[in-house]
Amino acid sequence: MTSKVIYKGSLRTEATHLRSGNTIITDAPTDNKGKGEAFSPTDLVATALASCMLTIMGIKANEMNINIEGASAEVKKIMAAGPRRIAQVIIVI
């Protein structure tokens, strides 16, 4: 098992990475009945994709002895309705 997620009520969850103990809080966004005080679950999906891209770039850069420290990604997530879902993720590296 990698993580454990607990529903805390009020449309909030707490996810714990079991090996390190690090935690992530999620909130439903304000446009979906939430508080919007933390990443939404769909924000994390889009953000995780960008994190994965930078990690893979880092692996290849290390193999090539190239320093990409400070590389960044800007993430834009576009939602669709009926049913509510991620319609598009735009990542600019």
Q: What annotation goes with each model-predicted range?
A:
Residues 1-47, 55-93:
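Extended beta-strand/beta-hairpin segments
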